[in-house]
């Protein structure tokens, strides 16, 4: 441990180093040009304060066509040398091998953590080799699973390291990219809130998407690996993307041209918002999914206008907490809601109530009459002040609301409301209500 402490004292760390782990799933599929482009992306990432760590999956040996231990080892070495050479014009990197032992129970044990720590503290990019030594034997093995990435994360989050660095991002770079979406027939899920969406995405992969057996297995394994990762380290942001997207050099901040890794380091957001309507032509299709542990969503929805929710009764039964709901609305809008007056107006006419986490965000949808017909109307959309800058909460609430009211949803906003740009992007139609200060929005 003294070597790590020495290294950290040497460079006098003034702040925690933010690491970004890139798991390269099939290095054997990469061209020299793609490796060079990755070097440029890594250089940009480092200029933004991120410290990249590259983990090479052992699946690259599928192009080796040999079972000989020595041949496999030489093949992996040659692939790592090729990567090192192609990166060398952009960043200083170092291949790390021998950091882990493969125990008899199949688990990886960190033998020399400073083998990863020291290069990071010296401003180098560690490239973790999938070749490990079998404990107690002079034999070597090639790790083909998520276990290697997981061991690297454990090493970087160990007590020795945790004061000096944090793991912020874990990026899976492979041929399949993000999780395919039935709804986005030509693209992938944009932002996945794993607590809320794991089962739905698993169901899509297994039952709803037309995939080859190999593609299905890759997507399922990615989903399960992300769940393992975020269950253990809930504050990490996961990304899944393709080689093409990960090595994009373009700087244009629009849709497909944005490198998703660089964009996420800058903003912690996907390159487009997950609550944008899929059907709109202006919503770009991407091959990247951002994955968060996310936030629990509670949804109370009614099927018909004559079955409006009784919020007071739900509060009495402990199903909801009106005191917390009032605090959320007050804090979000910066004014004191007269709850008694509000409930007199909407109670028993509430079409839906959506609550994110512990009342950190929420939406109240009411049934309103229009020409004798009941329509779902977004009465309140609120996010507490301290979470308003955090990507995703408004998106997650909005997405849950759109899923609950697919047929039709209306809302209005003052014409000078700065949030209107966000609303324009999420509505299918909108128009200015003549002679008033309101603009009406529609989706469905």
For each feature predicted by the language model, list its residue ranges.
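Nucleotide/pyrophosphate-binding catalytic subdomain
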Residues: 1-246, 312-319
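A conserved beta-strand-loop-helix scaffold within acyl/acetyltransferase catalytic domains
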Residues: 314-389
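Conserved acetyl-CoA-binding loop-helix of GNAT-fold acetyltransferases
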Residues: 389-402
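Alpha-helical repeat solenoid scaffolds
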Residues: 39, 223-231, 251-255, 259-268
């Amino acid at each position: 441990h003294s070597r790590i402490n020495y290294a950290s004292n040497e460079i006098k760390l003034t702040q925690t180093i933010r690491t970004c782990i890139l798991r390269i799933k099939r290095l054997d599929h990469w061209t020299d040009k793609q490796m060079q482009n990755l070097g440029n992306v890594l250089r940009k990432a480092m200029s933004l304060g991120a410290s990249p760590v590259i983990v090479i999956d052992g699946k690259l040996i599928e192009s080796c066509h040999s079972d000989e231990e020595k041949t496999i080892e030489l093949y992996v070495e040659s692939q790592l040398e090729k990567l090192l050479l192609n990166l060398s014009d952009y960043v200083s990197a170092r291949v790390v091998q021998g950091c882990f032992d493969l125990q008899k129970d199949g688990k990886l044990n960190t033998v020399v953590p400073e083998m990863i720590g020291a290069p990071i503290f010296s401003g180098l990019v560690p490239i973790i080799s999938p070749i490990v030594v079998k404990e107690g034997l002079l034999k070597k093995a090639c790790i083909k699973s998520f276990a290697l990435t997981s061991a690297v994360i454990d090493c970087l989050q160990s007590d020795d390291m945790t004061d000096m660095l944090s793991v912020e991002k874990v990026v899976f770079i492979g041929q399949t990219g993000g999780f395919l979406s039935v709804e986005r027939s030509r693209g992938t899920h944009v932002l996945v809130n794993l607590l809320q969406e794991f089962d739905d995405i698993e169901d899509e992969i297994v039952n709803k998407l037309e995939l080859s057996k190999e593609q299905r297995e890759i997507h399922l394994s990615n989903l399960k690996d992300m769940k393992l990762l975020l269950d253990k380290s809930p504050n990490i942001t996961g990304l899944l993307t393709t080689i093409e997207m990960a090595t994009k050099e373009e700087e244009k901040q629009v849709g497909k041209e944005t490198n998703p890794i660089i964009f996420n380091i800058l903003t912690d957001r996907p390159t487009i918002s997950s609550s944008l309507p899929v059907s709109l032509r202006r919503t770009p299709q991407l091959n990247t999914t951002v994955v968060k542990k996310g936030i629990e969503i509670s949804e109370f929805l009614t099927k018909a206008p004559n079955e409006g929710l009784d919020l007071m009764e739900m509060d009495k039964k402990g199903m909801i907490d009106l005191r917390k709901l009032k605090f959320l609305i007050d804090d979000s809008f910066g004014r004191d809601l007269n709850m008694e007056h509000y409930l007199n107006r909407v109670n028993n006419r509430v079409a839906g109530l959506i609550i994110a986490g512990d009342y950190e965000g929420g939406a109240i949808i009411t049934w309103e009459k229009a020409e004798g017909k009941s329509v779902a109307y977004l009465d309140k959309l609120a996010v507490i002040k301290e979470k308003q800058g955090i990507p995703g909460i408004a998106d997650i609430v909005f997405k849950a609301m759109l899923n609950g009211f697919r047929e039709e949803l209306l809302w209005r906003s003052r014409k000078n409301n700065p949030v209107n740009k966000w609303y324009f992007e999420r509505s299918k139609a909108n128009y200015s209500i003549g002679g008033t200060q309101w603009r009406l929005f529609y989706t469905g």
